[in-house]
Amino acid sequence: MTDFSLYLVTDPHLGGGPERVAGIVEDAINGGVTVVQLRDKDADEQTFREHAMELKRVCDRLGVPLFLNDRFAVAAELSCHVHIGQGDLPYVQARRQLPGHLMIGLTIETMDQLETVIADCTRAGIALPDVVGLGPVQATDTKPDAPQAVGVDGVAAMAKVARAHGIASVAIGGVGLANAADLARTGVDGLCVVSAIMAAPSPAEAARELLDVWEAGRRVAQPRVLTIAGTDPTGGAGVQADLKSIAAAGGFGMSVITALVAQNTHGVTGVHTPPADFLDEQLESVFSDVTVDAVKLGMLGRADTVRQVTGWLRTRPHGPVILDPVMVATSGDSLLDPDATEALLELATVVDVITPNIPELAVLCGEQPAPSFDAAIEQARRFATDVGTTVIVKGGHLTGPRADNAVVYPDGSVHMVANPRVDTTNSHGTGCSLSAALATRMGAGHPVDKALDWATRWLNEALRGADALQVGSGSGPVDHFAVTRRLLRAADATPWPHLRMGAPSDGIITPSDTQSPAPALAPAGPYTRALWEATGDVLGEILDSGFIRGLGDGTLSREEFLFYIDQDAHYLRQYSRALATLSSRAPDAPAQVDWATSAAECITVEAELHRTYLNKGLAETGVSAPSPVTMAYTDFLIARSHADDYVVGAAAVLPCYWLYAEIGLILAKQNHPEHPYTDWLDTYSGEGFLAGTVKAIARVEAAMAGAGPDQQRVAAQTYLSACVHEREFFDQATRQGWN
């Protein structure tokens, strides 16, 4: 299906003249333009043909369709699509004149014009326009003779009718950044612009800005997602898994049943297919009442069912369609009749995205299963090009430490999604779940690459939680709500346990329920020993967190690590101020020097590590703004070091030394020269940092020894609060990016 998100109409009088049009178009396509229309009313036939050939070479190379403005002979010769206006050849005649495989777009200025062309096509038995340009939205200098503007509301009304008849639509006339967001909510399939890009200093940047606003405006708070698939009584696959996945991805799930499947975690024992008229009745009940923002197709089973669903998708309005070509269950059981493959190939031309596993991709291509991920991508390239549909390549069926995914576009370009393999035998329904989550994110307005990034990350955590579910005695399901529950726990506003308990009647702090491991860096005396003995619960939570486990084994995503490094750069700036304050308040010269030296190191040695990572080209942007978690921690440190007793401030800054050193030494056992985060592991297990930590422990011991009982208890509670802030600081990287 053609992506009409950003439709560029050229103008030879903008951007420096006709000779610059091809360069502007190429730049604009690189910025995100998805369709190009060559318009040059004044050019003679030969000149127009030359310009069309030049643009065709650019568009073909970059995988973007090219429409020609009302030049049928040139379009037929060069195999280009055509756009016509109300004053050009009547649409029915145009459709009969142009070869059927070429698209025709039509300008629509009023509702009467739209209803007339639909009626004319129905009477003549002619296919409806492939796309209609609705407008003008407002008056525009590029078409001074344009009819009266219809406004955003007029576009919305016509877009609803067009969508109901399966006609794509774009808003035209006076479209730009000022109204792109409003137009994105009208139901049109894209924005059609001229001067907004042709006259821009940077066409690529102008295209990116328009596309960003368009995509943001298209996002639905809770997309309505329809799954059309078979069932799984044990809940791990089929529509049961789809509905869980849709909910987890933020959608409202609806379901139409194609087959009642008797299956569990061991396999399939029977399939019952309801009558075809009942499938029609189910589909009618949904499409006649509810706007469908996305469709996920799963098990269709039989050739007639595949063709039946294909017919519905061709004639009813809906958002993006994601096809999971369910042919073989994880258990090895066949879920598609042998004669249905041809019908499925036809369906693949109708959908937006197809998500086969490795064996299914091989069947679709008529080849042997790919032995490697690279080979699978090449298979997908051939299939995507032949069918014109985006393919998701999934590495889960391969072997090795990686289970990467990829988006393969019809033009052959690839978007890779890194994904560490999860060691589990409980993977029932992963294909259903990934495609349903993908459909939901796309239904919310996210492009397929961002949608796959999200769905891959989500499914990886769902797989990591699968073993704990204990559903069935075979290959069990994934934990669809693992992320949801983790984020709910993180959002809990209940006061931290050590603050609710208060200080003990004897001693300065209560030991943790979880025994603290023997520290690699020993306490400097009884007070720091008591602090360490209270650390076990928090330290255990930190070591068990997904962030620290991924940091240790190298599977932490690049995005999560860079978020952490970015926030740590903000943290160190404020932490150095807290240390400098302690230097000014320290009771003796050695402590003053040590705190001051530590403050300087924060903004030199360690900050250099962060600048190195952030400037390696690994981050799209430099240091951003501090997160709420980072601000809470740094504000806490600044307040404790400035406003409380010296001993309290000293206790507050200690966990950043001691916990980091202990964690760094534990993770160092997994370090190796090829480790993606070897610099970080080297730094926090290195002799320099460890020596500084030993001195900090000694300074806190001395401060505690010189303080009174009440000060000691406040300092101990402050130390534990800082430990919890450390846990939150590490964990925040795995909480961002889920919206």
UniProtKB/Swiss-Prot annotation:
Residues 527-739 are annotated as: Thiaminase-2. One of its GO terms (molecular function) is magnesium ion binding. One of its GO terms (biological process) is thiamine diphosphate biosynthetic process. Residues 226-481 are annotated as: Hydroxymethylpyrimidine/phosphomethylpyrimidine kinase. It comes from the Bacteria. Binds 1 Mg(2+) ion per subunit. Its EC number is 2.5.1.3, 2.7.1.49, 2.7.4.7. The keyword Transferase applies. Pathway: Cofactor biosynthesis; thiamine diphosphate biosynthesis; 4-amino-2-methyl-5-diphosphomethylpyrimidine from 5-amino-1-(5-phospho-D-ribosyl)imidazole: step 3/3; Cofactor biosynthesis; thiamine diphosphate biosynthesis; thiamine phosphate from 4-amino-2-methyl-5-diphosphomethylpyrimidine and 4-methyl-5-(2-phosphoethyl)-thiazole: step 1/1. It catalyses: 2-[(2R,5Z)-2-carboxy-4-methylthiazol-5(2H)-ylidene]ethyl phosphate + 4-amino-2-methyl-5-(diphosphooxymethyl)pyrimidine + 2 H(+) = thiamine phosphate + CO2 + diphosphate; 2-(2-carboxy-4-methylthiazol-5-yl)ethyl phosphate + 4-amino-2-methyl-5-(diphosphooxymethyl)pyrimidine + 2 H(+) = thiamine phosphate + CO2 + diphosphate; 4-methyl-5-(2-phosphooxyethyl)-thiazole + 4-amino-2-methyl-5-(diphosphooxymethyl)pyrimidine + H(+) = thiamine phosphate + diphosphate; 4-amino-5-hydroxymethyl-2-methylpyrimidine + ATP = 4-amino-2-methyl-5-(phosphooxymethyl)pyrimidine + ADP + H(+). The keyword Chaperone does not apply. Keywords: ATP-binding, Kinase, Magnesium, Metal-binding, Multifunctional enzyme, Nucleotide-binding, Thiamine biosynthesis, Transferase. CDD domains: HMPP_kinase, TenA_C-like, TMP_TenI. Residues 1-210 are annotated as: Thiamine-phosphate synthase. 4-amino-2-methyl-5-(diphosphooxymethyl)pyrimidine binds at residues 37-41, 69, 107, 143. GO terms for cellular component: cytosol. 4-amino-5-hydroxymethyl-2-methylpyrimidine binds at residue 263. There is also a ThiE protein in this bacteria (AC Q8FP55). Condenses 4-methyl-5-(beta-hydroxyethyl)thiazole monophosphate (THZ-P) and 2-methyl-4-amino-5-hydroxymethyl pyrimidine pyrophosphate (HMP-PP) to form thiamine monophosphate (TMP). Catalyzes the phosphorylation of hydroxymethylpyrimidine phosphate (HMP-P) to HMP-PP, and of HMP to HMP-P. HAMAP family: TMP_synthase. In the N-terminal section; belongs to the thiamine-phosphate synthase family. In the central section; belongs to the ThiD family. This is Thiamine biosynthesis multifunctional protein ThiED. It comes from Corynebacterium efficiens (strain DSM 44549 / YS-314 / AJ 12310 / JCM 11189 / NBRC 100395).
